Design a protein with these regions (language model features):
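PLP-dependent amino-acid enzyme catalytic core
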Residues: 1-208
Length: 208
């Protein structure tokens, strides 16, 4: 980090969420801490999630650890799938259901939820990327850890820069900042949406 700090002319720190230590790690683990807790509190026995993403892979691992069945909806057929995701789903006994490429994932997930509920399952639906009010708490907690670093290392972070995709990371950091009173510029880099759309998503999620 010394070279990067020198190049940027700033004291640059990195929060290593790739080393969160569960399954493949990453920021989604923070969200799953709260989402799995909520699922267990509601006595769910089945998780439903869409996409062959890092979030779905970590959800499959979490389901296995906590005794929850996991059903994953993915677009395309088996030959189209990411091999890493396939291996993870097989390793952790997640059931995979394939959808036509043009299928509406949200509608298909709702239909699957109803189907499993009719079979007597207690279903807990996971939003894409774990980005709902519960998952956002993972990054409210993360901001508390940033405050802890400030206290222990004696450094104040004037600017916190992060990727902003499904909005929960930025929303959680914003809420954590407001709760703690820690003054810092939060800079989210929108990775998939125009700034105006992403700003609206973050604000709505933070308000929940």
């Amino acid at each position: 980090m010394d070279h990067l700090s020198s190049y940027l002319r700033s004291d640059t720190w990195v929060m290593r969420d790739d080393l969160t230590g569960f399954a493949l790690g990453g920021n989604k683990v923070r969200k799953l801490d709260f989402l799995i807790g909520d699922a267990l509190a509601k006595h769910a026995d089945t998780l439903v999630v869409s996409g062959a993403s890092s979030f779905s892979r970590n959800a499959a691992a979490a389901g296995k650890v906590f005794g929850l069945d996991v059903v994953v909806l993915v677009s395309g057929d088996e030959d189209d799938q990411n091999r890493i995701s396939q291996a993870f789903f097989e390793e952790f006994d997640a059931q995979v259901r394939f959808l036509p490429d043009d299928a509406a994932t949200g509608t298909a997930q709702a239909q699957l939820r109803d189907e499993l509920t009719d079979q007597g399952r207690r279903v807990y639906e996971l939003h894409p990327g774990g980005s709902d009010a519960i998952g956002t708490l993972g990054y409210v907690e993360a901001f508390g850890q940033i405050c802890d670093v400030t206290d222990h290392a004696g450094v104040h972070f004037d600017r916190i820069v992060h990727a902003s995709g499904s909005a929960a990371t930025q929303a959680g950091l914003a809420v954590g900042s407001a709760i703690s009173g820690y003054v810092s510029d939060l800079v989210g880099i929108a990775i998939s949406q125009p700034e105006s759309v992403q700003r609206h998503r973050v604000q709505n999620l933070a308000a929940e």
